[in-house]
Amino acid sequence: MINTALVSFGMSGKVFHAPFIAANPNFNLVGSWERSTKNIVATYPGTKSYNSYEELLADSNIDLVVVNSPNDSHFAYVKSALLAGKHVVCEKAFTNTSAEAQELDELANKKGLKLAVYQNRRYDADFLTIQKLISEGEIGDFLDVQISFERYRTTLSPKKHKESVTPGAGLLYDLGPH
C-alpha cells in the first residue's frame, strides 16, 4: 500500500489525481495540503487536510507526494519532498529549465527515490490509435506529424499563475507538454 498525499486539492487534485488514487487498491489517499478550503475531507472521509506543506512532509506515514501545484512551484516542492525522503509524482510541466529537471533527477537517484512526471493525455484515444496502427504495420514511417490541441477563451484565466508573464506560465508550459 502506497500512502499518498496531494500538494493541492484544486481542479487537478479533484479530477486527475484523487479519484484514481482512491480507486486503486495499491494506493491509500492520506490527504492534501489545502491553503484555503478543506474540501478533501468532505469528499474523501478519513483523509487529512494539512495546514502547511511542511506538515505534509513531516508526516512519516506519507510515502508518495503528488506535486500538482502551479508550474513555477514544482521545482521547490519536488526538491523538498525528495529531501524529506518521499517518492514524487509531479505534474507537467515538470520544471522551468532542463538544469532544474536534471538536479531533481540526480537527487532522486542519489536518495534511491522514485520520481515521475504525470502527463494525463498519454492514454487518450488519438494517441493510442496511432500507436496501434504503427504496431500493426498499418502505417509506415512518419516524415512529419502535425497535432492540434486547442483551447479557446474569450477572457484571461482568473488563475494568475496560468496567464502571467513569469517562468512556467502561459500556453507553452500549460499545453505544450501534451
Language-model segment annotations:
Residues M1-Y44:
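N-terminal Rossmann-like dinucleotide-binding module
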Residues I2, L113, G140-L143:
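Nucleotide donor/acceptor-binding cores
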Residues N24, Y44, D59-S60, D124:
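Acidic-histidine catalytic/liganding microenvironments
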Residues G31, D63-L64, D144:
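Short, Asp-centered acidic motifs that coordinate Mg2+ and/or phosphate
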Residues V41-T47, E103-A108:
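Short, conserved SAM-binding/catalytic segment
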Residues K48-S52:
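Short acidic-hydrophobic, aromatic-tinged amphipathic segments that line or gate anion-handling sites
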Residues L64, P70-N71, F75-R122:
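Beta-strand-loop-alpha-helix segment that lines the small-molecule cofactor/substrate pocket
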Residues R122-H178:
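Predominantly a Rossmann-like dinucleotide-binding segment in NAD(P)-dependent oxidoreductases
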